[in-house]
């Protein structure tokens, strides 16, 4: 048995929180030891394997640990400095969801036109997750700008002071291919967009064609410049005569947050383009859905004004850059021709089954790249 004096001292320490302090110290020691071991393992593998080998190794480890409590896979990826594509790549379902939104808007517009009402896109009824009120009803879209070839709506994002925006527009003097390529070409954008401070591709995914970009842009004075790290993927559907580009914010170990800029961590953008005739003839409609959190202390109406006025300005600059590239024959990368146009139905099945085998392919009449 313990001596009475020692037992009394131990009990007194317990009442005063001594036992809790002892347990806390033990937890800190064990946690620190495991973190140091993990860092040592990461350094060892960094010396033994190349970056591509580490990426494959971490991908296998992520699949093994996926679903376990504590998200051990994300911790391992962060320690090894590897971006886990299995979690972050843009999936086919995200592209298809955007295409379905465009089709739904077109169907509603056709209904209005057939009933004798003057042709114009009706109020959109999106199915976007995360925009429902406390009763489970979808937030309604509010018209902000109504012009002949440019219509802008907005709706509140539940639980925030922010809005989601939607644009339906038309251009008749450039081709869909030209507009699409100018939007994707990062090198050309550095020339026509004066707000760009930095824009570069960080990493590409050979499986889906997604790629991660780092974009730094000026914001109106007196705000600091913002930087975005986001993943994007596009698809060109020849059979349904549509193009789609989807982007959203991610975290990447190669681009840590900088004190020079304000990191925008919430950002989503989906654009769908419907040619009036073909990809190489003038004329198309487009549907752009956009939301982000610029991390500003300005009131809601100020942020809303900046976005609702900045979006038409950006789209017009994009349009003018496309016209300039067309008229002056400026060389712009042709993303639509970046991959073969046609594949057999047998090849399509092989492509779908090989996505998990890290073999990038595309379906029939569909070209996918970032």
UniProtKB/Swiss-Prot annotation:
Tissues/organs with expression: Expressed in nasal epithelial cells. Down-regulated in nasal epithelial cells in patients experiencing an asthma exacerbation as compared to stable asthmatics and healthy controls.
Disulfide bonds: none
Pfam families, alphabetized: START (PF01852)
Transit peptide: 1-58
Record-marked site positions (Cleavage): 77-78
Signal peptide positions (record): none
Sections of the chain in a coiled coil: 86-111
Keyword Translocase: no
Keywords tagged on the record: Coiled coil, Mitochondrion, Transit peptide
Gene3D superfamilies: 3.30.530.20
PTM text: Proteolytically cleaved by PARL.
Domain START: from-to ranges: 112-327
BP GO terms, sorted: establishment of skin barrier; inflammatory response; mucociliary clearance; myeloid dendritic cell activation; type 2 immune response; ubiquinone biosynthetic process
GO MF entries: lipid binding; lipid transfer activity; molecular carrier activity
Region Disordered: start-end pairs: 111-138, 343-370
GO CC annotation: extracellular region; mitochondrial outer membrane; mitochondrion
Subcellular location: Mitochondrion
Function noted in UniProt: May play a protective role in mucosal tissues by preventing exaggerated allergic responses.
Protein name listed in UniProt: StAR-related lipid transfer protein 7, mitochondrial
Organism: Homo sapiens
């Amino acid at each position: 048995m313990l001596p009475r004096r020692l037992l009394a001292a131990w009990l007194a320490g317990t009442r005063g929180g001594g036992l809790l302090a002892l347990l806390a110290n033990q937890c800190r020691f064990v946690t620190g030891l495991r973190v140091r071991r993990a860092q040592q393992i990461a350094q060892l593998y960094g010396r033994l394997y190349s970056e591509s080998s580490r990426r494959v190794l971490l991908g296998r480890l992520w699949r093994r640990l996926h679903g376990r409590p504590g998200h051990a896979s994300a911790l391992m990826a962060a320690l090894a400095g590897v971006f886990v594509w299995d979690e972050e790549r843009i999936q086919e379902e995200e592209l298809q969801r955007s295409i379905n939104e465009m089709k739904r808007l077109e169907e509603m517009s056709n209904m209005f036109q057939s009933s004798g009402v003057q042709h114009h896109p009706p109020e959109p009824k999106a199915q976007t997750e995360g925009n429902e009120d406390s009763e489970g009803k979808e937030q309604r879209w509010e018209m902000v700008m109504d012009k002949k070839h440019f219509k802008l709506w907005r709706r509140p994002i539940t639980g925030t002071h922010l809005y989601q925006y939607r644009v339906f527009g038309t251009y008749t003097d450039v081709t869909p291919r030209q507009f699409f390529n100018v939007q994707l070409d990062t090198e050309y954008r550095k020339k026509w967009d004066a707000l760009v401070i930095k824009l570069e591709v960080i990493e590409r995914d050979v499986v889906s064609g997604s790629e991660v970009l780092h974009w730094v842009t000026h914001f109106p004075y007196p705000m600091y410049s913002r930087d975005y790290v986001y993943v994007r993927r596009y698809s060109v559907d020849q059979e349904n005569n549509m193009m789609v580009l989807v982007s959203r914010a991610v975290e990447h170990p190669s681009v840590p947050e900088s004190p020079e800029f304000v990191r925008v961590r919430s950002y989503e953008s989906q654009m769908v383009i419907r040619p009036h005739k073909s990809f190489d003839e003038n004329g198309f409609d487009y549907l752009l859905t956009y939301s982000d959190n610029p991390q500003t202390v300005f009131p809601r109406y100020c942020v809303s004004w900046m976005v609702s006025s900045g979006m038409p300005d950006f789209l017009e600059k994009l349009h003018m850059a496309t016209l300039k590239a067309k008229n002056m024959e400026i060389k712009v990368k042709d993303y639509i021709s970046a991959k073969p146009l046609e594949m057999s139905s047998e090849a399509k099945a092989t492509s779908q089954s090989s996505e998990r085998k890290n073999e990038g392919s595309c379906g029939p009449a569909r070209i996918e790249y970032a």
